[in-house]
């Protein structure tokens, strides 16, 4: 049930999903940990236990939690952060008019009511999860993640059936806190967890873990408001978004972001270049390192968990895009390309990259190294410009790692299916197995309005090949700013892609939900089918369009086939008949031959052509 609390500002969706209960699992190394999951109850006639699933929705789906958007979420990680003894509080920078696009009066979004003093690393310290992992420290965040990734399972007494092709990924039967630490230490996974975003519930991005998805939100200069964007965030995580990127490009960027972060249980990412551009009135040529640096600190103090930095767009690569069908389609990439050409010099993002690392390590802001030269059409896929930038991102990854900064790499884009695996293989090779984070890719260019589907195909494939996080695409891609409905469609599409990838990789727990739903389907437990689905509301609605009565919820057919042509009902009849007449013996008789009608010996005697 989606409950809207009208007294809150802004209004957000709360309430449990159907047949679902919020449960928590305690820690062992850190007994005070309470790791949230969702338990889906099944009908008593099933004789099956509840199905436990990963839950990124935060307190919004917990009926026991009182939501107060004006106060923000509980500061879950605050005590963990301070207990490490390597951070200090300070006054922070003053909010300036340009931070909100010079909005004033009624056009200015109200400040978030609660002001928190920002934290930063003490002098000479790195407060990143990578630094802790390299030092051999298993943090509370790491144990929290291990429990989450196991979907509530205890260490298996016997190995689960593994069925899949992992393409070199090493997904263990059971994730331990030490495994999490080692993957982070090796740079194969990141934990986006800014010390100024203690409200976030720890999660991990890496190819040896569950495939994650990101949802983009954000206002534009044309439309949307703070209330709409906060609700989009809550709505996105309700349906399974693991992270959210605020890509606001209009006014009030600072204040809108504060409302989002304070109420977000998932990591928040941004593209700082967008806000920096607003500060210079949208004139790319007027951007400076000083404006950009100030923006990084502003956002780090607020609690942004990962920055998209387009530092791989170099002056020498821009001519490589001239003969493309669609040129440079990345907003950040085009902004930096314009700046480089105007000043005829190397990007300040590239030249000041080590200083950017110093800022990120002081707050534990992870890098999402942007693919500013990604292909915007399948004609441009895997071209010289795209792969030249990827090589540079590999070089920048090593610099960031040397500074104890966490890194993931952004990828395309528009890529036909036969060229997708080359992207994954090359990224693993040149970026040292840093996590890959891709936008789709879209596998064809002919379907505006359906690009959630064209990209979902590519997302499932590249997720199987090893991409750690998939950035959703909505039906509005290339057409307009997504609304609440588009956000849900994009998230569900990408949850399908991510889950399909987990199944194909042979993740040990991935099939539990599939098998439970398949059994419910075969046994005509309609309510269980609805409740186990990624979108129970839509599944129930589609069923009830033609069979709306409660009696139909126990019927052994649906409107597609009716009672006489239902294959599963016929299968039940066949089983019953088999038990009655002892056809098991007949099946055994022909099992070796594999032909129900003619024994192998008779087949061998039959002349060809008869």
UniProtKB/Swiss-Prot annotation:
Residues engaged in binding [4Fe-4S] cluster: 558, 561, 566
Keyword Lyase: yes
UniProt GO MF annotations: 4 iron, 4 sulfur cluster binding; carbon-carbon lyase activity; zinc ion binding
Biological processes, Gene Ontology terms: thiamine biosynthetic process; thiamine diphosphate biosynthetic process
Cofactors named for this entry: [4Fe-4S] cluster
Matching InterPro entries: ThiC, ThiC-associated_dom, ThiC/Bza_core_dom, ThiC/BzaA/B
The protein's annotated pathway: Cofactor biosynthesis; thiamine diphosphate biosynthesis
Binding site for Zn(2+): 414, 478
Name this polypeptide is given: Phosphomethylpyrimidine synthase
Gene responsible for this protein: thiC
């Amino acid at each position: 049930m989606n409950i809207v609390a009208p007294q809150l500002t802004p209004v957000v969706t709360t309430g449990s999903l159907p047949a679902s209960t919020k449960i928590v699992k305690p820690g062992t190394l850190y007994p005070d940990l309470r790791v949230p999951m969702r338990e889906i109850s099944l009908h008593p006639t099933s004789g099956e236990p509840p199905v436990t699933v990963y839950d990124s929705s935060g307190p919004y789906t917990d009926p026991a939690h009182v939501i107060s958007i004006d106060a923000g979420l509980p500061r879950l990680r605050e005590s963990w952060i301070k207990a490490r003894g390597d951070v200090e509080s300070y006054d922070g920078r003053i909010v300036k008019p340009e931070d909100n696009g010079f909005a004033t009066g009624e056009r200015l979004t109200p400040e978030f009511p609660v002001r928190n003093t920002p934290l930063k690393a003490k002098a000479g310290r790195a407060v990143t999860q990578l630094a802790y992992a390299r030092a051999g420290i298993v943090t509370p965040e790491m144990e929290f993640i291990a429990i989450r990734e196991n979907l509530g399972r205890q260490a298996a007494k016997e190995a689960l059936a593994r069925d899949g092709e992992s393409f070199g990924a090493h997904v263990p039967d059971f994730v331990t806190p030490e495994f999490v630490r080692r993957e982070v230490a090796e740079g194969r996974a990141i934990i986006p967890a800014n010390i100024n975003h203690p409200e976030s519930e720890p999660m991990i991005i890496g190819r040896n873990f569950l495939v994650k998805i990101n949802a983009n939100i954000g206002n534009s200069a044309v439309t949307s408001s703070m209330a709409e964007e906060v609700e989009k965030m809550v709505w996105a995580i309700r349906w399974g978004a693991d992270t959210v990127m605020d890509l606001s490009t209009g006014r009030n960027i600072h204040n809108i972001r504060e409302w989002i972060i304070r109420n977000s249980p998932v990591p928040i990412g941004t593209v700082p270049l967008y806000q920096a551009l607003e500060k210079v009135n949208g004139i790319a040529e007027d951007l400076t390192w000083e404006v950009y640096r100030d923006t990084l600190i502003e956002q780090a103090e607020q609690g942004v968990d990962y920055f998209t930095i387009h530092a791989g767009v170099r002056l020498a690569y821009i001519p490589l895009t001239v003969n493309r069908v669609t040129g440079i389609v990345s907003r950040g990439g085009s902004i930096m390309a314009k700046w480089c050409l105007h000043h005829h010099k190397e990007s300040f993002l590239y030249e000041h990259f080590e200083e950017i690392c110093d800022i990120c390590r002081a707050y534990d802001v992870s890098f999402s190294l942007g693919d500013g030269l990604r292909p915007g059409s399948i004609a441009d896929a895997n071209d010289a410009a795209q792969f030249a930038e990827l090589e540079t991102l590999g070089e920048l990854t090593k610099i960031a790692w040397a500074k104890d900064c966490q890194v993931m790499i952004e990828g395309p884009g528009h890529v036909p299916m036969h060229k997708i695996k080359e992207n994954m293989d090359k990224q693993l090779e040149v970026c040292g197995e840093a996590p890959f984070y891709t936008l789709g890719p879209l596998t064809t260019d002919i379907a505006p309005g359906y690009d959630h589907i064209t990209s979902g195909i590519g997302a499932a494939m590249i997720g199987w090949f090893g991409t750690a996080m998939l950035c959703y695409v909505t039906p509005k891609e290339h057409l307009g700013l997504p609304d609440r409905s588009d956000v849900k469609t994009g998230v569900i599409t990408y949850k399908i892609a991510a889950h399909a990838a987990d199944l194909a990789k042979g993740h040990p727990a991935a099939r539990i939900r599939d098998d439970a739903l398949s059994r419910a389907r075969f046994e005509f437990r309609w309510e269980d089918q609805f409740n186990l689905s990624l979108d129970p509301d839509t599944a129930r609605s589609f069923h009830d369009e033609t069979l709306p009565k409660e009696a139909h919820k126990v019927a052994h057919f649906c409107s597609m086939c009716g009672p006489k042509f239902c294959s599963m009902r016929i299968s039940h009849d066949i089983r019953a008949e088999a038990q009655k007449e002892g056809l098991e013996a007949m099946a055994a008789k022909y099992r070796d031959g594999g032909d129900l009608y003619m024994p192998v010996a008779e087949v061998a005697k039959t002349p060809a052509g008869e």
